[in-house]
Amino acid sequence: ESESEVLIMNISDKIKYIGVDDTTLDLFESQYAVPDGVSYNSYVILDDKTAIMDTVDKRGMKDWENNLLNALDGRNADYVIIQHMEPDHAGSLARLIELFPEITVVGNAKTFVMINQFFENINIKNSLTVKEGDTLNLGSHTLTFVMAPMVHWPEVMVTYESSEKVLFSADGFGKFGALSLTENADWACEARRYY
């Protein structure tokens, strides 16, 4: 079990970072040394409709759930956008569906094939399959989906929110390291190792 640190950050008034640091993980994907741990990145957009951008690995699920419920402040979760099926992005999807059974799961065609491979008997009541250039309006925020296969895996997509000009980049532009441990670290050096 992970010792994770709770982090909630305002990206803007309506977009919140609800990810979790995991400072006890030694090897990412059982092969990459991560002496500074990792951060599992997840965001929530609070508009007329709410959208969760990715979930987190099961190791950080309890803290992420607390972050999410705090950020929602009693509101319903309308959408979850699954940009990447790797467990550090989608590992808590089944728990999210338990919490919000009517949530709409948003992904591309490959995402839904992989969901059924990763989760046995997952009960998705509502789903939305998106393709290149499709949009999803949340109110004052509009999400545009851009396919990015093999940024890491074949189903990867990124999501652009046009009103605030925010790119949710899945595994693109990332690096290893828990945010709480690497706040003042040399970003470029670790990013080079990641890529």
Where are these predicted regions, by residue range?
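Metallo-beta-lactamase
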Residues: N10-D13, G107-Y195
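Active-site environment of divalent metal-dependent phosphoester hydrolases
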Residues: M85-A90, F112-I115, H152-W153, G174-G177
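Short, Lys/Arg-enriched N-terminal segments with co-localized hydrophobic residues
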Residues: E1-I8
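Conserved beta-strand hairpin/beta-sheet module of binuclear metal-dependent hydrolase folds
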Residues: I8-L68, V158-E161, K165-S169
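Short coil/turn connectors at secondary-structure junctions
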Residues: D48-K49, A77, P101-E102, I124-K125, ...
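Active-site metal-binding motif and surrounding structural segment of the metallo-beta-lactamase
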Residues: D48, R59-V106
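Short, flexible loop segments at the rims of nucleotide/cofactor-binding pockets, characterized by
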Residues: F28-A33, V56-K58, I82-H84, L143-P149
